[in-house]
């Protein structure tokens, strides 16, 4: 991205990256919150499909606010996501992974080559340890909100770069 000369290509690449991040973090958050709300409400009694539709629209409304008009068929969006039944409560892991990678990338930008050996060790370890143990060599506390904020800060920087390029190109 840094070395590309065509600013319109840079704009397209930045848009794609930002959209991917939004889809992974915010969209998966909607799915997670919908599942939590549905199970919480189910604990109070049976739920009708209309009640599930309302929960779906409510959680999606939190993401989109007034920026997107959700047409009538969208209320059934929850019904085609099979993992709500077969593999419950795993969407949070997409959010966790995306923000972890963004925050680790920010660390790499700050530390440079000194970061690489620890990162390679992290990759080699795979799922052999708990997440908190995997990131301990980086001095990361997964319970510290400021660590997670660094991922969002990186997205903000990408967005600001996109704004500058778009303004310069008149798009």
Where are these regions (language model features)?
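C-terminal, non-catalytic "cap/extension" segments appended to globular domains
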Residues: 1-8, 24, 28, 32, ...
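Short beta-alpha connecting loops at secondary-structure transitions
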Residues: 13-20, 39
